[in-house]
Structure formats: C-alpha cells, structure tokens
C-alpha cells in the first residue's frame, strides 16, 4: 500500500502515455497480489499501524514524503497509541509485529520518564514557592495511600499516628475491664441484680469475691469487646508495617534526598580571597550567597533509588504495583 503512494503520478500536469502505461501495469500486478489472504492481512496491518504513527510526525517530514514512507524508523511510534485505557478497556496487542512492539515499548517508557521529570520539576517549584512565601513548616510528602481505620471516628492510618492508635486501644480495653470487673458488680449489688454462677470459679482462682456477682451478659460483652478491639489493633499494625515496607528505604517515601552541595539550605556561600593594602586592617565584607545550581534552591535532589516515586524497587516488573488495585 505504501508503494502505491510513492508511485503516484508526476507533479507536472503533462501525462505521458509511457508513464501512464507503466503505472497501470504496476497497479494491476499489485492488485493481483492482494488476492491472497495472508498478504492482504499483512499489508492492512502495516497500513493501520503506519496511519496511526503518521499522526505524531512533524510537519517538517512532509518535504521528504517518499523516503519517510519507505523507511520505518523508531521516531514514528504512535504518540496516541494506548494499550490499556482503563480496567475495562484493554486493546488486543497480540497481533502486533515484533518491530511495532519494540517501538511501543520504547515510546511508553520514554513517556514514563517524561512524566516523572515533570513531577520532579513541579515539586521543585513548589518548594521554591514555599520558601518565597516563608512557609517554614515542611510537611513530609507521601505518595502512598493512607489505609482507612477499622476503628470508628479515628483518622486514616499512618506511621505518624500509630501511637494514637495504641493509646486508644489500651484505653478502651482498660475501660471495658474496669466496667465489667468493678463498676458492673457494684451496680448489680446495689440494685439487687446479678447471680452466683461464677462464685465457685472465683473462689478456686483466689480472686475477690466481688467478681462473682458479675452478670453473664456483662462478662460476655466485656470479653467479646476486648477480643474485637485486639483483633482490629492487630490489623491496623499490619497495615502500617505493609505501608512502611513499600516505602523507599533511602528517602522514606518522600522521593527526594537532601542536597549534599548546599547541605539542604538551597544557597551557596561565595568565598572570595581577602587582600590587604599597606598592612591596613579593614573589616571583612559580609559573605555573599547564591542559589544552589544543583537543587535550584530547593535543598532537595531526586532519589536515584526510587526515581521520585517514593516506592521501594520501582520497576515495571514489580508485582506489588497493580494499576487496577
């Protein structure tokens, strides 16, 4: 199909019978070749992918149209080609040729690094704006999602507020034990309620006899509540540990490290030699500073381990990274 475009009529308007006869014979032979199903499928597949790749080519390539169609360079990879548009729309790419697969892999990997570079520059600009506005409190950036808490009325789970979960859990357990062991028996004695079903057991384990007045319903409620809260706390701790394992060990999930050139200050002190004239003592001038060129004044540089993602072992083969999760 691409040779039909190349073997078009000449640019001048003089149609010579000789050239017209050659073009007619060549097109007839080419049409006869299309009778085989295998050749037609191959050419149609090549034309489909070439038509998609032609949308992303520059306008400068129009001057050399004939050699650009014949050649198949890697810079003609489709810019709008998307294999996975969402969890429900996944295109069938099993029929693609080897060259097309390699070109699309190269193109998509380049797009990934371009997007990561955009995120890096946006974060640098964000830090610069915060420094210009005088925002001294620097919150730690965390790209990993927060796990919702199983305990009601508590904030999302993270490693920073894990102590709050411990305090809440122990407070609830202590309150339930005090209610079931001391408060409930006292109220039952004053109200004339309760029973002696646990009296023998309390006496055998040498506990205060006041505990024998506990109602079975209260005891069941207290024991069940303590077990449920303990199980929820175990789940919360496991979620925190899983979240910490997914973070990068070097940048702790922030995606950036402190700049070693400016010592995380964002500015460099210019050291100038001091010269004296006639042995006179003159006061030294104040040192001058300039913006660090390594970190652009932000005090942070990209983490080379996670490539600004904040995730440990950021790789396209990492089984923990699930785009549909």
UniProtKB/Swiss-Prot annotation:
Keywords: Chloroplast, Membrane, Plastid, Repeat, Transit peptide, Transmembrane, Transmembrane helix
Transmembrane segments: 164-184, 217-237
Skewed-composition ranges (Low complexity): 53-71
CXXCXGXG motif repeats: 248-255, 292-299
Region feature (CR-type-like): 226-317
Transit peptide: 1-54
Main location: plastid
Cellular compartments annotated: Plastid, Chloroplast membrane
GO biological process: positive regulation of carotenoid biosynthetic process
PANTHER family named among the record's database cross-references: OS02G0651300 PROTEIN, PLASTID TRANSCRIPTIONALLY ACTIVE PROTEIN
Family: Belongs to the orange-like family.
Misc remark: Its sequence is related to the DnaJ family but lacks the J domain. The CR-type-like region is similar to CR-type zinc-fingers.
Protein's UniProt name: Protein ORANGE-ORANGE, chloroplastic
Upper taxonomic lineage: Eukaryota, Viridiplantae, Streptophyta, Embryophyta, Tracheophyta
